[in-house]
Amino acid sequence: MEGAELIIQEINREAEQKIQYILSEAQKEAEKIKEEARKRAEDRAQWILRKAKTQAEMEKQRAIASARLEVRKKRLEVQEEMIRAVLSALRERLASLPADEYFQTLVTLTTEALEELNIDSAVVRSNEETLKLIVEKLPEFKKSVSEKLGKEVEITVGEPISTIGGVLVESSDGSVRVDNTFEARIERLEADLRARIAKALFG
């Protein structure tokens, strides 16, 4: 009887050891699974965080780019407004030149046109007030232009045109012309004027 009990005790002891081993292995496996799950969760969290940071940086850069674009747009609008104001003031200044200064300007513009056309006889056209000034001083006008050119030229006053000032000079038959009205001169020089005005105003 005592031998049977010993056998039963041994069996129970071995069973208990197996149970403890199984439980221990199960615990280890559970910890391993938990650790792997934690690591995956952590990796996932890090990935989400990196993605969020990347998206946030992209949004930040987009916002900065948009703000810079808006600032540039506003700056260009202000620049354009100021350039237009300067050009408008220039037109007004040219349209209100004192008579003597304006007369000399007309002589210069006519001389330049005749040089470009390479003709000795021309028709000069402008607004009514300008033509009236030229007619009043026609002998002096012809003499001044001739002296600048270094040769005698024949100048005829033509029909009035719509302009704030300056002259349109054309050949007697109207086949060739040079538009030296103030509007045309400003238009031809506008790109250069804009660059100079922008540099003066904005550096």
UniProtKB/Swiss-Prot annotation:
Q: Which domain of life is it from?
A: Archaea
Q: Which UniProt keywords apply?
A: ATP synthesis, Cell membrane, Hydrogen ion transport, Ion transport, Membrane, Transport
Q: Name one GO cellular component term.
A: plasma membrane
Alphabetized GO MF terms:
ATP binding; proton-transporting ATP synthase activity, rotational mechanism; proton-transporting ATPase activity, rotational mechanism
InterPro entries per record: ATP_synth_B-like_membr_sf (IPR028987), ATPase_E_C (IPR038495), ATPase_V1_Esu (IPR002842)
Where in the cell is the protein located? Cell membrane
| Cytoplasm is among the record's keywords | no
Which biological processes are named by the entry's GO terms? proton motive force-driven plasma membrane ATP synthesis
Q: How does it sit in the membrane?
A: Peripheral membrane protein
Main site of residence?
membrane
What is the role of this chain? Answer: Component of the A-type ATP synthase that produces ATP from ADP in the presence of a proton gradient across the membrane.
Q: Which NCBIfam families match?
A: PRK03963.1
Give the UniProt family note: Belongs to the V-ATPase E subunit family.
Q: How does it assemble?
A: Has multiple subunits with at least A(3), B(3), C, D, E, F, H, I and proteolipid K(x).
- Protein name, UniProt field: A-type ATP synthase subunit E
What is the scientific name of the source organism? Thermococcus kodakarensis (strain ATCC BAA-918 / JCM 12380 / KOD1) (Pyrococcus kodakaraensis (strain KOD1))
